[in-house]
Structures are given as C-alpha cells and as structure tokens.
C-alpha cells in the first residue's frame, strides 16, 4: 500500500511531466516531486543535502536536457522503465521486510539502483549515498547531527527510531 504522501508525490511527478508536455515521466521528475515529500525530505536533511541547490539542478536538467520528451499529444505522461523499476523494487522490498506501507523515503533509497540516471548523479554530486539514506531510515543515524534536532522539532514520523533511545 502506498502512503498518502507517496500517492501525492507520484501524482506530482506525473502531473509535472504532463505540465511540461513530456511524453514520459522520468526519475528526474520523480526526484523533483520527492523534494516535497515529507518522508523523503527528512532523509535529504539527514544526508546533509542542500535542497534548494538540488531543486535548481533537477529543474535545469529537466528544462534543458529533456526537451526531446516534449510531445504534441495531450495524454498523460507515462512512467519510464526506470521509474517503474524503482517502484517495483520498493514494493518488493517493503513486502519482504514485513512492512505494510511504501513511502517516499523507500523510493529515494530504491532510486540508487538506477546508477545510470541523472537523478542519482545529482544526489551523488552532494555526496549522498544509498547507505546514508538506509542508515537514517533503519537506524536513525544521520549523516549530519543537526538534522536530528530538526526532525524532532517537526515531529517527523521517521523519528520513531530515535524516540526509542
């Protein structure tokens, strides 16, 4: 089952691609949408990401490098194979781990398997790794310590791990 936040994130990704008249929704569209997903944002902060810079970089890539996706058809944007693989990986992982709900943090981790994507390149440009994200989600270990205070102040659900300490 998808969390409400993830449902909204996927809708934003597909709607953003459609708004740009792109035939396909790519991982970059998904990454842009994850920048507004509370679960993913907590992970971004834990990994020390500069979200403003990341947003600018993703938008620059989408606007300048994906112009070949512009279509004259007015239909909905279709997820690329990479986009679909990420969602399939998340579903399999969450199901095998015994959890019931997929969220944006899970999607962010799964994106790292798409090594050839520009979305992953942009994450790595700011020194974010899959391990950084997994450490935060699974163990509450932030790459940067000030994020723990941020997450506690905002009572983010991913902080349940820290509250057990």
Label each PLM-derived region with a short phrase.
Residues 1-165:
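Histone-fold recognition with a strong bias for associated Lys/Arg-rich disordered tails
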